[in-house]
Amino acid sequence: MSKTFVEVAESVGVDEKTIGNVFKDYVALKEREYQFETPKWLGIDEIHIIRRPRLVLTNIECRTIYDIKPNRNKETVIQRFLEISDRTYIEYVTMDMWKPYKDAVNTILPHAKVVVDKFHVVRMANQALDNVRKSLKAHMSQKERRTLMRERFILLKRKHDLNERESFLLDTWLGNLPALKEAYELKEEFYWIWDTPDPDEGHLRYSQWRHRCMSSNSKDAYKDLVRAVDNWHVEIFNYFDKRLTNAYTESINSIIRQVERMGRGYSFDALRAKILFNEKLHKKRKPRFNSSAFNKAMLYDTFNWYEVNDHDITDNLGVDFSTLIKNLEKGDL
């Protein structure tokens, strides 16, 4: 998989179509050979490969890639779920607010709890604040507009993360622009909702925030966020069960961009195979000791210590994020 179909075809003297057919057989073989362990906490996200959004499934607990599919259509998600024989093992599914994902989970994994990724929600608060900032530019001098644009990142950072200089600049802007101050405080208070570990406190904080927001001059800027939380309330607040997010999968897109740069001329299927079927990228672990099976074997005198202590048996958890990143940095994939 280190060469494109065209390069292989030229080197062995056959046409590109023949190489493509051989590759399909190879992929089918590897699909059977590498059966990744079903995640207890499944992440659904998307990555852009060859200019299109693709479905990526991750194991949140183990920080691995579980699978990558050519599109994120509801039918594709449903079909992939149906291929998981032990899908009842899945307890939580994290996602963004893409309804086809939710519909697919409710259809095939009705026992699993849907969790909307918190970072997709709080990002909307940042977008609302930035929209207020943009609306104020019309009343500023050209110098003020340039300065506010250059320092917009200060507005988007959490207040407790600002250094002394940034805090001074923020106070200056908010002191001169009351509308920006109000929008900024709403952004900070929305983030504050997710700082508590207590779900009841989280609900209370949101209720108070929503009331203040709808009574403010910034309500139009935040209306999309309010509507999203109203429509996905249960799934958003399921976050407090385990505080699960897809945060680490944000690195996927940068990873894939590196893969694409290294593999100009590759098809989606070839890039997918380079990632999923590269055994040196796989994270493995010894299975947990099955005490009930051990006790049963002892009871019926069928105990075999070699089978229980088989060092060759491992669980394949998928493509490890950290290993993938390290190999890409070395140009080794």
Predicted features by range, described:
Residues M1, G13, K24, A28, ...:
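Non-catalytic alpha-helical coupling and interface elements of nucleotide-dependent molecular machines
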Residues E7-V12:
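Short alpha-helical "recognition helix" segments of helix-turn-helix
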Residues P70-N73, D117-V122:
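Short, acidic/turn-prone active-site loops that include or flank metal/cofactor-
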